[in-house]
Amino acid sequence: MKVLFATGEAFPFVKTGGLGDVSYSLPKTLKQKENVDIRVILPKYSKISNELLKDARHLGHKEIWVAHHNEYVGIEEVELEGVIYYFVDNERYFKRPNVYGEFDDCERFLFFCKAVVETMDITKFKPDIIHCNDWQSALIPIYLKERGIYDVKTIFTIHNLRFQGFFFNNVIEDLLEIDRAKYFQEDGLKYYDMISFLKGGVVYSDYITTVSDSYAEEIKTQELGEGIHGLFQKYDYKLSGIVNGIDKISYPLSKKPHKILKADLQKKLGLDVEEDTPLIVIITRLDRQKGLDYIVEKFDEMMSLGIQFILLGTGEKRYEHFFAYQEYLHKGQVCSYIGFNQELSTEIYAGADIFLMPSVFEPCGLSQMIAMRYGCIPVVRETGGLKDTVKPYNEYTGEGDGFGFKQANADDMIKTLKYAIKMYHRPNVWQEIIKNAKKRDNSWDKPAKRYKELYQRLIEG
């Protein structure tokens, strides 16, 4: 079984979000645990450190026709932890300050999609399946069909439907160079007067997955379908969810007791050292999607509950300013770390008591699973992957490894948080919840097995 995993990013080479984590951990697990010959292909961004590419081997180069001109494409190969990574080299498109968000992203990533299809002769790797991820690789199924390559199956995984790769429709002829009459239609790339790259993956791939079972159902609704819920209803027969996992090796556990880790964290971040005060944390991109408006609305009430609060994240300035001001108002009780620090994030997971994640929607989410590994109990809104990975605690049965609320509003969030704090002040109960959280298997083993089964099913037809 040969699989080519096409992605816009992969840790440790380049990462802007959860896709980078998945593109590292899933192929590694499929290779090591399921014996799948899987290789990863991504752009060779100038942001990738020379140290990571020092052993890169140049496999070859050629010119491909893109946007009405010939364009150089080179392929370089690096092996990491048993997985081969191919890098699509072109300085015109990928020697940029940003991974995404450039003025010509349309041309950059249609080039990438074409290059994936056109360089199999260079890699000498003919896959049974190309596994595409998000809009950056969503045109690959189209270019395979345009080239008449029908013996390579395609899977398209949606990591976040909100990002669809919208562009003006004139690029169909000007850049994509495909038949407008054939592809600019509702059951094609058309999205109102624009085109959506992501729709290419949805319509033309052989199978669609999302990153959790619940999210696969949610994108069929008007509320969370981002304008194409009808398309997912139509293609329901080839759609399913497979919840992500976490790479446990990336999150090593400390041998120190929690109370020491908590005290160390409090000292490091300038909080009063208070062993019995519930320490509530959020580690997130500061974006409305993450439910931050609920926290802003109820922040004064939260602080009245006798808690400490840590924020680690960066994003919208209005949130950055709000949380920075709260640190000023609540010296010794609030720390707002605007930015991101991997080492600090691990210390926060290990030293905190409650992880707050009230997302408006969440395709999967990794933070809640990382928190549970460290015994930091998640309080989440029951949506998408949060619903699938956190079982709300039931004090009558003793079952559950976190706390959840169903409706997307601030009142339900604060009500659930109060209940979690109430349980926190019952030490025996709280230790039972921690025990439940730590024993939950959030590894990549089960998801990798499900993907292998899906690959096998598609190959067998």
From Swiss-Prot:
<dbReference type="GO" id="GO:0009011">
    <property type="term" value="F:alpha-1,4-glucan glucosyltransferase (ADP-glucose donor) activity"/>
</dbReference>
<keyword id="KW-0320">Glycogen biosynthesis</keyword>
<dbReference type="GO" id="GO:0005978">
    <property type="term" value="P:glycogen biosynthetic process"/>
</dbReference>
<feature type="binding site">
    <location>
        <position position="15"/>
    </location>
    <ligand>
        <name>ADP-alpha-D-glucose</name>
    </ligand>
</feature>
<keyword id="KW-0808">Transferase</keyword>
<dbReference type="InterPro" id="IPR001296">
    <property type="entry name" value="Glyco_trans_1"/>
</dbReference>
<dbReference type="InterPro" id="IPR013534">
    <property type="entry name" value="Starch_synth_cat_dom"/>
</dbReference>
<comment type="function">
    <text>Synthesizes alpha-1,4-glucan chains using ADP-glucose.</text>
</comment>
<dbReference type="GO" id="GO:0004373">
    <property type="term" value="F:alpha-1,4-glucan glucosyltransferase (UDP-glucose donor) activity"/>
</dbReference>
<dbReference type="Pfam" id="PF00534">
    <property type="entry name" value="Glycos_transf_1"/>
</dbReference>
<keyword id="KW-0328">Glycosyltransferase</keyword>
<comment type="similarity">
    <text>Belongs to the glycosyltransferase 1 family. Bacterial/plant glycogen synthase subfamily.</text>
</comment>
<dbReference type="Pfam" id="PF08323">
    <property type="entry name" value="Glyco_transf_5"/>
</dbReference>
<comment type="pathway">
    <text>Glycan biosynthesis; glycogen biosynthesis.</text>
</comment>
<protein>
    <recommendedName>
        <fullName>Glycogen synthase</fullName>
        <ecNumber>2.4.1.21</ecNumber>
    </recommendedName>
</protein>
<dbReference type="InterPro" id="IPR011835">
    <property type="entry name" value="GS/SS"/>
</dbReference>
